[in-house]
Curated annotation (Swiss-Prot):
Its main location: nucleus. This is MAU2 chromatid cohesion factor homolog. It comes from Drosophila sechellia (Fruit fly). One of its GO terms (cellular component) is nucleoplasm. One of its GO terms (biological process) is maintenance of mitotic sister chromatid cohesion. Interacts with Nipped-B to form the cohesin loading complex.
Amino acid sequence: MSASTSTSTAASQDACYISLLGLAEYFRTSQPPNIKKCIQCLQALFTFMPPSKVEARTHLQMGQILMAYTKNIDLARQHLEKAWSISEPLPNFDVKFDTASLLAQLHLQTDRNSHQAKAMLRRAVELSQNNVYWHCKLLLQLSQIHASDREYSLASELLAVGAESADEASATYLKVLFLLSRAMILMIERKTNDVLALLNSAGQIIDNNIPNPHQKEYLKVFFLVLQVCYYLALGQVKTVKPSLKQLQMSIQTIMAPNWPSDEAIFGANQLEMFVWLPKEQLYVLVYLVTVSHSMMAGYMDKAQKYTEKALTQIEKLKQQEDKPILSVFKVILLEHIVMCRMVMGNRELAIREIAAARDVCMAAPQRSLLRRHSAQLHCLIGLYSMSTNLFEHAERQFVVCVSETSERDLKLFANLNLAIIYLRTKRDTDLKQILDAVSTENTHTYSSQALMGGFYYVQGLHAFHKNSFHEAKRFLRETLKMANAEDLNRLTSCSLVLLSHVFLSIGNSKESMNMVTPAMQLASKIPDIHVQLWGSAILKDLHRMSKDVQHEKDAYANHVKYSENLIADQRKCVQSAHHELVNWFQGDPPVTSGPPAVPVLLMPESSVTASVPVIASTSAAMQPAGQYGQFY
């Protein structure tokens, strides 16, 4: 064959490739898309025996189309594996990286574990060292998988490598993304000092070395979300306020109508084509951390208002595109609203929303959300069971929570609630054992100020029940000191009402009144029906002692009102189909459509153990500020 004939044949083949690719794209973008004909066009390319690079790219495109538009995962895998085997040895050919990234995603969808996905990405990371964009993208993808598997040290190491690679390429924006992502992992690991150092370093770069004002604002939102979560994890509700206010202002700036699209901000430079979350999702996340703050500060009305706004926004986004992270946000918000309902005495609504959270978890592919949130759901059902006097069920729920979770704050929270159960059921040996264990485990380790305040509160409650009033006062004053320092209003109100009861028990009616009055004011502001029930009983006794008949009548009337509200709500709980969830201890939670099966006491407790402070735990991996539960 002459050179001219060979050239003519090659040109003719190129024209065929281009025509078939153009036709395939035409069918793909038709309304509606004609995927069958699109695939036929791509398949036809192979009949021309194309060069290796064209063949590999076509196999990649086939894999992409099959994954995006069909359920034929096996065929998609075959094409992607073929693309990988052809492209892997070819130098300076990006198709291998795109293929590895997609194959890893496919392995995560279909395999029981992530070993193959990790192996594929590790190989691609090795091959991509001369391509900064793909090297960084693959490092982020691999670190995300390790983080999802709770292999935080490995995730952190990969993110550190990414920060170095971005730094060597003078990609400052990308470097800050890696630094902040690593700070998020270290926060989950409770490496408090390392988190602070990274946040300080990233903050200085954002302030001084990011010239693009739009990218700067995005990084600022990421930075402030982490800073707010850091303070909330420490239980520092008062300290966090300036950062939270700044975050709320920044998100308003980003959501303004004149703000450019994400594509316009991040589309110009390949090394800036990385976004932590699109602005619409950031908007929901800011609502979420605001809800977290309101819950911890004891502003239930605010928490409910922001939760409802966030859930509305999530539903709008789901209608556009149902991203998995929206379900994560929804579950965390539902966990918060459940806690609000129980503090306010709306337990029937709480169990309904626990069921809603269960439904979101069950709908996620491969039960991934249920695995991550099962312990939290058991904890919430434990709180619900406590509030309806089902102590045996509550105990089993908390024990399951402790056995399932690796989150130390959630474990501490569940154990403190177990201590309350043992106190109320007079199991002194179990109570002593759990308090000793909690004390030993948390003496020399980092814990939330709110949680540690709750620990002192439980010890004060225990001392009160032993009639060790001096010891009770000592523990409760320590609790008050911690609560007042950070505006933990519910912890404050519960401590004040218990202190009031301590003083009442030793006959000091003046100090008792001095404690119960601000407790009731705070409880009304929260509002916390359990503290109000308890406080009204104390006020009734105090007014009777001082022979103030009218105020005694008023206090008694209030006490009856709170009691009747709780009794009416408990009747609704018993009648709710979702009440059956109290019997879920293992496996998948039941679908609650049948009649309730558990008999429940209808008389609410008004004893001093009926209400204990809200304590918030920390987030699950890669999900900032996921908070769990309150004591009862």
